[in-house]
From Swiss-Prot:
E.C. code: 1.-.-.-
Family of this protein: Belongs to the paxM FAD-dependent monooxygenase family.
Name this protein carries in UniProt: FAD-dependent monooxygenase aurC
Source organism of this protein record: Calcarisporium arbuscula (Dendryphion arbuscula)
Membrane topology designation: Single-pass membrane protein
Residues making up the signal peptide according to the UniProt record: 1-21
């Protein structure tokens, strides 16, 4: 369409940044990517989950087939409680039946390689470009890097992660123009209560192909996914000894990751396999804090932040990367409409600001519930508190597809690139998923019946333990230590 007079400066060659670049490419909008590292590839061994809401956009971009080739299929999910009680579901199969696209887990390093390889013009990537400042001009915006280079454009997009320089510059500029644009209290809402050791291990001797296994434990959980061949991805998500707030969230060393993993080595994983057996076969791992928060203000003038820079969630729901892909598509939709409606002239800053405000408002509304769900699931799987312990052990297994149904609603509510026709694979024929359905299988009345039965079971268990306890009802739950 020839609308190359509008230029986007993307800061960060992340999954979010490269997905946005692919979207802009398809929309015919000019862009450049500034990456502070010498290359864009993450450390191997860190897994990322792809859900249908992210995969359908990759399919629109012609990327999904390459990504899918990296994926080892998952058919079942096994959720184990500390006492060995197991909830077995066919959720991965239900996802494919419902959406035509699977839930898959792949190596982030390999995913980034695929995204990068699909660019025909790699000259738009500029490596070793650490951003130091952003400045607004009369009709444009400029970005200066540590080596003294300056890049000019119409919009700066911060796709540079949770430690975003673009976000910091946006706050600085916003507070100069309007004191109180972002307060110290708002900044401190970005916090970490949990951390994770992400890793990948070779096959455990005698162990065949893996499925998705979740092991709930008090103050931590294990997550396992099939990797290439008989290799296995592992996540050890654990509660920190205190809540850390921005900017004082620590970064962890390999030694700290080793200490954590060795401390949980005797906990069971699957049949006779202990975690120490997997840890002994490790190929690569890293230990990181799990920051959580979504900021309300994502933009100021010609600056917008997307992905982890403004919407950071824990990995338990597997939606951080997928919702970032959604945001890249949604931002592109808005920019394309803005640019085409003003062509051949550039849109004014006010018009751009209105587009960014609409994008900000819609994405915040979309992700607010997802963030709440992710926070809850993280704490549920770490059995953080009596109510969550009771729900996980005595209620969840009797609620059918409740949690998976919630995932279905999240997936079905995602957006797409509105200027690329949908195919059957990218969700053209996805059936609606109203709130009272879960996977289109269980009606709300079925859930109510299941929940009533489960609640009765909980009541009976609590009363029975209370009657057996000399201390009475108050110790009925607290005394229920779970052991293997």
């Amino acid at each position: 369409m020839g609308a190359y007079s509008f230029r986007v400066i993307i800061v960060g060659g992340s999954i979010t940044g490269m997905t946005l670049a692919h979207c802009l490419d398809r929309a015919g909008i000019d862009y450049v990517i500034l990456e502070k590292h010498k290359d864009i590839f993450a450390e191997p061994g860190i897994s990322i989950g792809l859900m249908p809401n992210g995969s359908r956009i990759l399919e629109q971009l012609g990327i999904y087939s390459d990504v899918h080739a990296l994926f080892e299929g998952i058919k079942k999910i096994y959720q184990y409680m500390p006492d060995g009680y197991c909830i077995e579901t066919d959720s991965p199969v239900n996802i494919v039946d419902r959406f035509g696209l699977p839930f898959c887990v792949i190596d982030r390093y390999q995913f980034l390689k695929v995204l990068y390889s699909k660019f025909e013009d790699k000259s738009r990537f500029h490596m070793n470009k650490k951003v130091t400042s952003i400045c607004h001009g009369k009709s444009d915006v400029s970005v200066t890097t540590a080596d003294g280079e300056t890049y000019h454009g119409d919009l700066v997009v911060g796709a540079d992660g949770v430690h975003s320089v673009v976000r910091s510059e946006m706050w600085r500029i916003g507070n100069l123009a309007r004191p109180g644009f972002v307060t110290e209290r708002e900044k401190s809402e970005l916090a970490a209560e949990f951390a994770c050791v992400f890793g990948v291990a070779k096959a455990v001797p005698g162990q065949g192909r893996w499925e998705h296994i979740l092991r709930y434990n008090e103050d931590f959980c294990f997550m396992f996914f099939p990797a290439s061949g008989t290799d296995v991805f592992f996540n050890v998500i654990y509660k920190l000894n205190q809540k850390y707030v921005y900017p004082d969230i620590p970064r962890f060393t390999k030694e700290e990751g080793i200490e954590v993993c060795e401390s949980v080595g005797d906990f069971p994983v699957w049949e006779d396999v202990k975690f120490r057996d997997i840890w002994a076969q490790r190929i690569a791992f890293t230990c990181v804090p799990l920051e959580e928060h979504m900021f309300k203000n994502w933009h100021h003038r010609r600056i917008i932040c997307v992905g982890d820079s403004v919407s950071k969630m824990s990995p338990n729901m597997g939606q951080g990367g997928n919702t970032a892909i959604e945001s890249a598509a949604a931002l592109t939709n808005g920019l394309r409409k803005l640019v085409t409606s003003n062509y051949p002239d550039k849109p004014s800053e006010r018009q751009l600001s209105n587009t960014l405000e609409t994008f900000n408002r819609n994405q915040f509304k979309r992700l607010n519930t997802v963030h709440g769900d992710a926070r809850y699931v993280t704490r549920l799987e770490a059995l953080d508190g009596t109510l969550k312990r009771v729900f996980a052990r005595y209620v969840m297994g009797h609620c059918g597809d409740l949690l998976v149904g919630n995932l279905a609603r999240i997936v079905a509510g995602g957006g797409v690139l509105d200027f690329i026709p949908l195919t059957a694979r990218s969700g053209k024929d996805w059936p609606p998923c109203p709130w009272q359905h879960s996977w289109g299988i269980s009606e709300s009345i079925d859930f109510c019946k299941k929940f009533a039965v489960a609640s009765l079971i909980v009541l009976i268990v609590v009363l029975a333990r209370a009657l057996d306890s000399p201390a009475g009802l108050s110790s009925g739950i607290r005394s229920s230590s779970w052991s293997f």
